[in-house]
Design a protein with these regions (language model features):
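Extracellular jelly-roll beta-sandwich "head" domains, especially the C-terminal globular C1q domain
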Residues: 4-167
């Protein structure tokens, strides 16, 4: 039984329940980018498939690298947990050096989510992952993306981004 069904069934004269359950419904979106893609320095990883559709508080345009988190809430803020995992490598012809991705909020990479690897050679795949809480004030919006924070173009494959409304 969902929280909404429970609330509606308990509305009797002798039994009242506060409708705080509206905020507790599960809101989640999962988007992926399975194909190998080249991401230039400072650009966002594109997500081409939607595995789990979001709700009106988590919005994504197919093929875009950005999701929009909306602060639709009766509280002071909405809290989202954003998780990313994927494989990265230096493309053929690239320089062997440290490469990195980071979760970016409103265009600014979060340094605490920076995923750094140093391959021994080009085309060596490494798996990276990070997650961060993002607070969105009531009535506002924030954008979230996964950004290439390296100094060169990198190749990304099997990207998976999950956004979950926590509170």
């Amino acid at each position: 039984m969902s929280a909404m069904q429970y609330y509606l069934q308990t509305q009797r004269a002798d039994y009242n329940v506060c409708p705080y359950f509206y905020e507790r419904e599960v809101k989640i979106m999962e988007i992926t980018g399975i194909a190998l893609q080249t991401v230039t320095a400072g650009e966002d990883v594109a997500f081409t498939e939607t595995a789990v559709n979001g709700t009106k508080c988590i919005v994504h345009r197919q093929g875009s690298g950005i999701i929009k988190l909306r602060g639709i809430t009766n509280q002071c803020k909405a809290r989202f947990l954003v998780s990313y995992s994927g494989n990265i490598q230096i493309p053929t012809g690239g320089t062997v050096e440290a490469i990195s991705l980071a979760i970016a909020v409103d265009g600014e990479p979060l340094q605490s989510t920076r995923m750094i690897v140093t391959p021994a050679a080009v085309e060596n795949l490494f798996n990276v992952s990070a997650q961060a809480y993002v607070d969105v004030p009531c009535g506002c919006c924030s954008t979230v993306a996964v950004q290439n924070t390296s100094t060169q173009a990198i190749e990304v494959q099997n990207s998976n981004l999950i956004a979950v409304r926590e509170a």
